[in-house]
Amino acid sequence: MNIVDQQTFRDAMSCMGAAVNIITTDGPAGRAGFTASAVCSVTDTPPTLLVCLNRGASVWPVFNENRTLCVNTLSAGQEPLSNLFGGKTPMEHRFAAARWQTGVTGCPQLEKALVSFDCRISQVVSVGTHDILFCAIEAIHRHATPYGLVWFDRSYHALMRPAC
């Protein structure tokens, strides 16, 4: 039996490129946000995506109580914002670093994100240290920027949308 240790798993996962997202919420438990690359599509009928959130994260209780979130997929050039939301910076300073609109769920939408998915959490499944949040998409807001941002091999990389 081959047992995969934590470092081997993390090293292997660094080979999988992923979009960089800031996940936000606002509601009775307050306003919070964090950076995540563990986000993916589940189904288009009904439109659903998933977000993985460590139950030990300081933001977990806020998302758990609010039950709404917005997945803001970042554009190239927004790396400093990703770093800010990925650290221990106080929430008010994180949100003060960018311009936001309010989505239909009441969650903050980043004005210059590549795309924003405004969602209600429809189901939560716990696996190991994380909760997998299944998110029913209520609204999508796409932005005109031609540059995406991915996390690959432990660093940021810009992607350019092909010219039509």
Curated annotation (Swiss-Prot):
InterPro entries: Flavin_Rdtase-like_dom (IPR002563), NADH-dep_flavin_reductase (IPR050268), RutF (IPR019917), Split_barrel_FMN-bd (IPR012349). Disulfide bonds: none annotated. GO terms for molecular function: FMN binding; FMN reductase (NADH) activity; FMN reductase [NAD(P)H] activity; riboflavin reductase (NADPH) activity. Signal peptide: none annotated. It is an enzyme of class 1 (oxidoreductase). Gene3D superfamilies: Electron Transport, Fmn-binding Protein, Chain A. SMART domains: Flavin_Reduct (SM00903). Keywords: Flavoprotein, FMN, NAD, Oxidoreductase. Catalyzes the reduction of FMN to FMNH2 which is used to reduce pyrimidine by RutA via the Rut pathway. Belongs to the non-flavoprotein flavin reductase family. RutF subfamily. This is FMN reductase (NADH) RutF. It comes from Escherichia coli O150:H5 (strain SE15). The lineage of its organism: Bacteria, Pseudomonadati, Pseudomonadota, Gammaproteobacteria, Enterobacterales.
